[in-house]
Swiss-Prot record:
Entry's Gene Ontology molecular function annotations: D-ribose pyranase activity; intramolecular lyase activity; monosaccharide binding
PANTHER family referenced in this protein's UniProt entry, alphabetically: D-RIBOSE PYRANASE
The UniProt record lists the keyword Cytoplasm: yes
Compartment list: Cytoplasm
Organism: Exiguobacterium sibiricum (strain DSM 17290 / CCUG 55495 / CIP 109462 / JCM 13490 / 255-15)
Record pathway: Carbohydrate metabolism; D-ribose degradation; D-ribose 5-phosphate from beta-D-ribopyranose: step 1/2
NCBIfam families named in the record: PRK11797.1 (NF008761)
Assigned keywords, A-Z: Carbohydrate metabolism, Cytoplasm, Isomerase
Designated gene of the protein: rbsD
EC number: 5.4.99.62
Protein name: D-ribose pyranase
Protein residues bound to substrate: 28, 96, 118-120
Reaction equation(s) it catalyzes: beta-D-ribopyranose = beta-D-ribofuranose
InterPro entries: D-ribose_pyranase, RbsD-like_sf, RbsD_FucU
Active site per database record: 20
């Protein structure tokens, strides 16, 4: 058994396999998941686990170079936006429709139980050196 970091074996494997600029998505429970994109479904009930918790834990174990968010998060979900801003990496904003198109390129979408609007982020992998 691991002593530190993410215990979920699927997420641990995805993070270990990422290369520079690869992307993963952390999503609320309503974001459509495109055909062909791997899904790790953590949702247990509405709100559990939260977007904020999953972002914090995954980002602590991942070299994040940049994030992409839907522009709509700025007005609709300041709590989720604040959680992402704490990562202290450059942010790119696109429309929600463009965001959904970008998810088609992700290595995986991690679905949380979050049930608030636009609580979705694309994490771009950096390097550890």
């Amino acid at each position: 058994m691991k002593r530190h970091g993410i215990l979920n074996s699927q997420i641990s494997k995805v993070l270990a396999d990422l290369g520079h600029t690869d992307t993963i998505v952390i999503a609320d429970c309503g974001l459509p998941i495109p055909a062909g994109v791997a899904r790790i479904d953590l949702a247990l009930e509405l709100g559990t686990p939260s977007f904020v918790d999953v972002v914090r834990i995954v980002a602590d174990d991942m070299a994040v170079e940049q994030v992409t968010l839907a522009t709509e998060i700025k007005a609709a979900n300041p709590v989720a936006l604040e959680a992402v801003m704490k990562l202290d990496v450059p942010q790119d904003y696109v429309s929600h429709e463009a965001f959904k198109e970008l998810t088609k390129q992700a290595k995986v979408i991690i679905r949380t139980g979050e049930a608030t609007p636009y609580a979705n982020v694309i994490l771009h992998a950096g390097v550890i050196f």
